[in-house]
Amino acid sequence: MQTTGALLISPALLRSCTRGLIRPVSASFLSRPEIPSEQPPCSSVPLQVARREFQTSVVSRDIDTAAKFIGAGAATVGVAGSGAGIGTVFGSLIIGYARNPSLKQQLFSYAILGFALFEAMGLFCLMVAFLILFAM
């Protein structure tokens, strides 16, 4: 039977070499550099210790940028809906006033309320688009 090199490694050496693998990411980045102890170095062991780093390639950055623009474009569709809603509200105001001029004040107050609701939704959609573009 063949024995592999992994079975011949002492437990202390294995613990010292895999210490970086079991630490949380925040502890790996925020801790101070460790003082070397009297344990044997890991360089003689054929184990490859994985380093936890945030790496972004050009392709992943391009995908993130494209996703930002697609999300912001989808959020601005609501602004067009807001414009259509405001047009509908004031069109209905004109039609209602033409049918019954005595209700001018009540129709106008309802039209202003409808305008405010549609305008708020449009501004909310625009705010979400800007948040997607500049805050993420």
UniProtKB/Swiss-Prot annotation:
Question: One Pfam family name from the record?
Answer: ATP-synt_C
Localization, per the record, is: Mitochondrion membrane
Example of a GO biological process term? proton motive force-driven ATP synthesis
User: Where are the residues marked Reversibly protonated during proton transport as a site?
Assistant: 119
Q: Name one GO cellular component term.
A: mitochondrial membrane
What residue range does the UniProt record give for the transit peptide?
1-61
- Recorded GO MF terms: lipid binding; proton channel activity
Recount the PTM note. Trimethylated by ATPSCKMT at Lys-104. Methylation is required for proper incorporation of the C subunit into the ATP synthase complex and mitochondrial respiration.
Q: Which residues are modified to N6,N6,N6-trimethyllysine?
A: 104
Arranged from A to Z, the UniProt key words for this protein are: CF(0), Hydrogen ion transport, Ion transport, Lipid-binding, Membrane, Methylation, Mitochondrion, Transit peptide, Transmembrane, Transmembrane helix, Transport
- Top-level taxonomic group: Eukaryota
Residues crossing the lipid bilayer are 77-97, 112-132
Where does it mainly reside? mitochondrion
Topology with respect to the bilayer: Multi-pass membrane protein
Q: Which reaction does it catalyse?
A: H(+)(in) = H(+)(out)
- Describe, as the record does, how this protein assembles with itself and its partners: Homooctamer; the c-ring consists of eight c subunits forming a circle, and each subunit adopts a hairpin shape. Component of the ATP synthase complex composed at least of ATP5F1A/subunit alpha, ATP5F1B/subunit beta, ATP5MC1/subunit c (homooctomer), MT-ATP6/subunit a, MT-ATP8/subunit 8, ATP5ME/subunit e, ATP5MF/subunit f, ATP5MG/subunit g, ATP5MK/subunit k, ATP5MJ/subunit j, ATP5F1C/subunit gamma, ATP5F1D/subunit delta, ATP5F1E/subunit epsilon, ATP5PF/subunit F6, ATP5PB/subunit b, ATP5PD/subunit d, ATP5PO/subunit OSCP.
- Task performed by this protein: Subunit c, of the mitochondrial membrane ATP synthase complex (F(1)F(0) ATP synthase or Complex V) that produces ATP from ADP in the presence of a proton gradient across the membrane which is generated by electron transport complexes of the respiratory chain. ATP synthase complex consist of a soluble F(1) head domain - the catalytic core - and a membrane F(1) domain - the membrane proton channel. These two domains are linked by a central stalk rotating inside the F(1) region and a stationary peripheral stalk.
Q: Which family does it belong to?
A: Belongs to the ATPase C chain family.
Illness association: This protein is the major protein stored in the storage bodies of animals or humans affected with ceroid lipofuscinosis (Batten disease).
General remark: There are three genes which encode the ATP synthase proteolipid and they specify precursors with different import sequences but identical mature proteins.
Q: What is this protein called?
A: ATP synthase F(0) complex subunit C1, mitochondrial
The organism is Sus scrofa
